[in-house]
């Protein structure tokens, strides 16, 4: 009937009969039974294979000596530790990346607290300039005229003549400070004036010493030049001999004055202090 209806072209009038439905249901049931039997046999085969594999592995493990098993266990432990360390390092890096600025500041404070006397840590990072340097511009070099050959050699006599007014200014300043010290009543102000006078007087003394050394050495050179003209060999002074000449000139300039006595007393005190330092220390008395 279905075939006749299809030939006629009327699909809406097609109605399956009971016989056709019974035939299809019986065929489906037979297919399902076959599939279930196949699956059950596959599962049974898998279970049997797993059992045989387990039995074979157990036999192999029984045949392995205990020392080899211990070595394998240690190797597994070491690999596990390495794996955890690598993962820990990766986690710490990720934490640093996703760390908030407040957390990083707290870490910096803790680090500073831990290392109190450590040197200051400075970042080596530098901002990239916006403009690229196409032409290299040489950096201007600063020049100190005191130590540069372009300024020429130092002529001490010329400098003294050119800057002689500085010495006169210092002498006038010393007189002014001495007068101010007499009239001043404040203790702090008096101390400051005394310090200023001390520094100025020491500068004057230093200037006089330099002039004396220059004069003594100049006289010695002139005398040696005269001896060379007479056909004698030149004699060059050592540092120790220069000091002796300067001391003799100093004694001659202070002869017949109280300044020589004061100078000798100071010198004796210095020598006594040096000798005292060289003496061995006294042992403590044992009770």
Curated annotation (Swiss-Prot):
Q: Does the keyword Iron apply?
A: no
Where is this chain compositionally biased, Basic residues type?
267-281
Biased composition regions of type Basic and acidic residues, renumbered to the chain: 201-229, 256-266
Q: Which GO terms describe its cellular component?
A: 90S preribosome; nucleolus
What stretch or stretches form a coiled coil here?
30-63, 167-215
Q: Where is this region: Disordered?
A: 1-131, 201-236, 256-287
Where is this gene product found? Nucleus, Nucleolus
UniProt-listed Pfam families: RRP36
Give the GO terms filed under biological process for this record.
maturation of SSU-rRNA from tricistronic rRNA transcript (SSU-rRNA, 5.8S rRNA, LSU-rRNA)
Please give the family membership noted in the entry.
Belongs to the RRP36 family.
Q: How does it assemble?
A: Associates with 90S and pre-40S pre-ribosomal particles.
Task: Quote the protein name from its UniProt record.
Answer: rRNA biogenesis protein rrp36
Organism, by scientific name, is: Schizosaccharomyces japonicus (strain yFS275 / FY16936) (Fission yeast)
């Amino acid at each position: 009937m279905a075939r006749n209806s299809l030939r006629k072209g009327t699909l809406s009038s097609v109605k399956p009969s009971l016989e056709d439905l019974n035939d299809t249901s019986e065929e489906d049931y037979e297919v399902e039974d076959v599939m279930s039997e196949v699956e059950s046999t596959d599962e049974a085969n898998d279970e049997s294979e797993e059992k045989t594999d387990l039995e074979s592995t157990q036999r192999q493990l029984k045949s392995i000596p205990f020392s080899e098993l211990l070595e394998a266990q240690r190797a597994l432990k070491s690999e596990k530790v390495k794996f955890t360390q690598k993962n820990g390092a990766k986690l710490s890096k990720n934490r640093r990346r996703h760390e908030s600025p407040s957390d990083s500041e707290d870490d910096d404070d803790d680090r500073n607290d831990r290392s109190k006397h450590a040197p200051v840590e400075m970042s080596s990072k530098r901002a990239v300039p916006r403009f690229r340097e196409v032409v290299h511009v040489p950096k201007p070099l600063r020049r100190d005229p005191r130590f540069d050959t372009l300024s020429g050699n130092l002529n001490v006599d010329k400098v003294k003549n050119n800057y002689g007014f500085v010495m006169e200014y210092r002498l006038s300043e010393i007189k002014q400070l001495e007068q101010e010290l007499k009239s001043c009543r404040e203790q702090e102000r008096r101390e400051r004036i005394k310090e200023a006078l001390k520094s100025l007087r020491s500068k004057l003394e230093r200037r006089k010493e330099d002039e004396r050394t220059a004069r003594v050495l100049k006289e010695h050179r002139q005398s040696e030049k005269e001896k060379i003209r007479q056909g004698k060999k030149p004699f060059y002074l050592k540092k120790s001999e220069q000091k002796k000449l300067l001391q003799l000139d100093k004694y001659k300039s202070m002869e017949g004055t109280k300044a020589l006595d004061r100078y000798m007393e100071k010198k004796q005190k210095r020598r006594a202090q040096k000798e005292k330092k060289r003496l061995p220390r006294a042992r403590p008395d044992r009770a």
